[in-house]
Each structure stands twice: as structure tokens, then as C-alpha cells.
């Protein structure tokens, strides 16, 4: 394999200067998603976008199935009688709920699920009898509905979240439930690593935890414009839901005890993060494992008389790749130039492009172009499959490395409010000394003009032996670092 063109990746200026405008452009031009559906916050997945989504869903299923989770499917309707049982939950969600206001004869009030804790608990109560039925781990990938009043954005802030994976687990005690929380965090790390996403893991502050949770752990990625995007959450719910739904089990000692529960969710936001993180002004780069087409083959010939010279080697190449289990597509469109096809498939994020022209036929070789760096290599046909496998692995590693390098360069510490404000304006995530007091934390948010992501779980959260003061409450000694950022 011989390098014949050095790296010359596309610029990212347009992406960074107006990320949402760029994202709309990508979704439209790459034929991923259509935003023109006439309901605010509800959009259409187009065939190519749906193929990407299915690959991500299969990844999610794989890591849940491998860890003892079982897939279920619950109705979209939740009786208000159930929804209203957990006081903090209804307080947190009632303003976002879509109500079923009509439907045949007037009957009980129904809501369209915003999340399914209150739908699942009444059924779990019927399924669990004694300690032998625990732990119980189920998940579903469904639509959930939230009446967003803020500005909606495709895949990022929706009224219908159509790829909502929610897992719900039930345990005998707090210790086992918190072990499940740790496992859920590991599952999400594996999913996001496969998507080549970099992430911060934060314990959300009390004022921003999931409604009805004892605590919430969140995964946040930082987009190229410096704003954070929440891409996954894990909640320890304690006995908050099992108390009100009377979910108990008979223990081995013959006593009846309350079960403990967890829940954790991920949605199409993760796909948005993947497309944007690996995006540039030419389109995006899909991680090879998740790309519907891993290799596109472009025949290069001029005039119909050259086609019979080139096409046999093109088809041989495609067959070799197919037989090796590589997802390959040959673009044989005669009404499009090779240059147009290069642009088109770069836009759609296909990781590798194979070019075969008349000179390549004479040498029994092909030219491989990487989407991430636009480097080109000349490879003999006999070595092509091995070269493609090697380059796909290299593309994946480069996407992951690049994402982590960019994220790590954005996290800074600030021991002064003005320094913190300046860092936020530069698109940084700022770690600020905090006493742990909720009122002081909320005041820090206001002073800095950013949102609190919480305390870091992927780094040392303690300020250690430093004599630092809470930046909003100077009379208090700081104990923790509080992360803040601008946020989608």
C-alpha cells in the first residue's frame, strides 16, 4: 500500500461558525432526515439516515442483550392515575406532557409517555413475587413525547423522540441497584466508544437530576462550537417509585421488602453528536462499523468505449470486498462525473472510497481514499481486502483520537468568576470551586451565565488540600469542582 496523496482534510469553519445551520445543511444534502414535516419538533427519517439509525440501535441492543437485559414493548399510553403517583416525577414532567384529549367515548385521562417509569412499575408489581425474580432488567426502543416549549432542533431537542432506548431494572437492595448503575455507565461507555464519541461523565446537581431520582449520572459530549450536549443518562431511583406502586418481594428470610430501581436512557441525540463530532465543511465521516456503506467504488472512465475496460475490475473488486463481509456499493451512474460522485459520497460520510480507472486496470491496482483525512493510497487488487480492513480500523481509531483530543483541550479550571465567564465565551467547559451547597451552585450558574453539568465522575471531583472558596458564597470553603458549560 503506497501513499500517493498526503492528508488534506476539509475545513470546519462553516460547522463551527453556525453549527445548527450546518447541521440542517448536512441532514438535507446527505438525505438523512427531513425537517419539513408540518409539526414542530417532529421530523422524518429518510432511508439512508434510517440505515445509520438501525446500525446504532443494533449496537445498543448488542450491549444490553450481552449484559442480561431483555427487550420489551410497552404501550404509548399511560393512565393519569399511574403518571400522577410519584409526586416529584409529575412535578418534573407535567408541563411537558401531551394529553390524549379525545378518542371515542370520554373515559380516563391518558398521557403519551414522556418516559416509562410509571408505565412499567404497575406491571413489574405483577411480575415479581420473591427474591428469585430479582434482578429484573428490561429495555425498549420507542417513541416518547415531550411538549418542548424551547426552540426545537433536529435530533437534538424534539417533541417526538423516536429512538428512545430506556432500560428499567429492579433489585433487592440499594447495593445491587448501585452495582447496576455502574454497569449501565460501562455499557454507555462501550456504546459511545464504538460511535467514536468523547464524553464527560458528571453527577448532575440536585436541582437538575431526573424527576423522581435519588441521583442522576449524565454523559455529556462537547460539540465543535463549545456547547455541551447530553447524550445519555443513568438514574438511581431508590424506592421512590416502588413505594408508591407497592413493588415488593418476599425475601429469603420470609419478610416482604421494597424493591430498588434504576433507569437509563439514550436517544437519537447520540446520532446527532456522532454526525456533528465527525463533521466538516464537506459533510461527515461515519465510523466504519456503523456506516451503511463502508466502501464506495467509483469507476473512472471517459466515453462508453472505456467502460468495458474498467467495469470488469470494478465488479471483481466489489465481489472481493463483499465476500470479505465488507458493505460495498458500486456507483455506476453514467450521468454523474467522478468528481460529483466524490463530493456526494464524502457528504454522506462513507469511510473509504475506491477509485478504478483505465491506468489502474493496466496495473491491476485500485486507489483508496480515506474520508477522514482525504489521504490516498495505491493498492494492488490482491492486497485490497487487507488494505481496506486496515484502513477502516485506522479511520475508526483516528475519529476516536481526534474527538478525545478536542474534548480534553476544552476542559479548564477557573478560580475566578471573570476568568470562568471568559472561558465559557471561548467554548470551554469550566470547573469551578464549589462548596456543594445547592443555593450556592445555582448562584454560580447565574454569575457565570452557564449551565451546571455537575461534579466530575471521570476525574477527581475533590479540590483536595487547596484552600479554595466557593465562588458564589465566599464564606464557604470549596470542597468540589463544579463543571459548567453552555448547553444545548
Swiss-Prot record:
Q: Which PROSITE patterns match?
A: AA_TRNA_LIGASE_II
One short Pfam name that applies is HGTP_anticodon
Keywords tagged on the record: Aminoacyl-tRNA synthetase, ATP-binding, Cytoplasm, Ligase, Nucleotide-binding, Protein biosynthesis
Hey, what's the signal peptide range on this chain?
Answer: none
Query: Which InterPro entries does the entry link to?
Result: aa-tRNA-synt_IIb, aa-tRNA-synth_II, aa-tRNA-synth_II/BPL/LPL, Anticodon-bd, Anticodon-bd_dom_sf, Pro-tRNA-ligase_IIa, Pro-tRNA-ligase_IIa_arc-type, Pro-tRNA_ligase_II_C
Task: Report which reactions are catalysed by this protein.
Answer: tRNA(Pro) + L-proline + ATP = L-prolyl-tRNA(Pro) + AMP + diphosphate
Location of this chain's protein in the cell: Cytoplasm
The UniProt entry's GO CC annotations, sorted and at most eight, read: cytoplasm
Give the family this protein belongs to, as stated in its UniProt record.
Answer: Belongs to the class-II aminoacyl-tRNA synthetase family. ProS type 3 subfamily.
NCBIfam families assigned: proS_fam_I (TIGR00408)
Function, as annotated: Catalyzes the attachment of proline to tRNA(Pro) in a two-step reaction: proline is first activated by ATP to form Pro-AMP and then transferred to the acceptor end of tRNA(Pro).
Q: What is this protein called?
A: Proline--tRNA ligase
Species: Pyrobaculum aerophilum (strain ATCC 51768 / DSM 7523 / JCM 9630 / CIP 104966 / NBRC 100827 / IM2)
Gene expressing this chain: proS
